[in-house]
């Protein structure tokens, strides 16, 4: 249980720091941090916990919640639309679609599936490691 709480608090800190940084970070760097750091924290601590399915469930729920709050926070910032326009000009050579419309269900669904798939793979890896020992 302590690793679950540690994971939730560490991920809250990651999203808290990102929220504090706000729009003062490159959008690709922010996207990479959002996609990589929370799953790294959860993955590393997953191998230390004994409550596998509960750990996966609560990590997905809370990380999705943190992600949602982070995005809603960014969209309420007064400079958000100008930030998106500037970033799109900077990324004109890369085919990335960034919209300034409301944050929606498809983003949460993608992030949930992303987390779920990685944690399921880690779950089966952990089971294989336990059986070999």
From Swiss-Prot:
Official protein name in the record: Protein msa
Domain of life: Bacteria
Segments passing through the bilayer: 3-23, 27-47, 55-75, 103-123
Functional note: Accessory element involved in the expression of sarA and several virulence factors. Modulates SarA production and/or function in a strain-dependent manner. Affects the transcription of the accessory gene regulator (agr) and genes encoding virulence factors including alpha toxin (hla) and protein A (spa).
Coiled coil: none
Gene Ontology cellular component terms for the protein in this record: plasma membrane
Membrane topology, record value: Multi-pass membrane protein
Keyword set, alphabetical order: Cell membrane, Membrane, Transmembrane, Transmembrane helix
Annotated compartments: Cell membrane
């Amino acid at each position: 249980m302590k690793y679950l709480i540690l994971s939730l608090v560490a991920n809250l800190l990651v999203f808290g720091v990102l929220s504090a940084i706000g729009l003062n970070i490159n959008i690709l760097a922010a996207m990479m941090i959002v996609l990589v750091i929370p799953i790294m924290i959860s993955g590393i601590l997953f191998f230390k916990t004994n409550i596998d399915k509960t750990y996966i469930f609560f990590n997905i729920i809370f990380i999705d919640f943190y992600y949602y709050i982070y995005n809603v926070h960014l969209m309420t910032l007064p400079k958000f639309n100008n930030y998106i326009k500037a970033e799109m000009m900077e990324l004109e050579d890369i085919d990335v679609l960034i919209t300034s419309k409301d944050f929606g269900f498809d983003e949460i669904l993608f992030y949930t599936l992303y987390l779920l798939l990685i944690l399921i793979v880690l779950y089966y890896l952990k089971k294989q490691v336990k059986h070999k020992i």
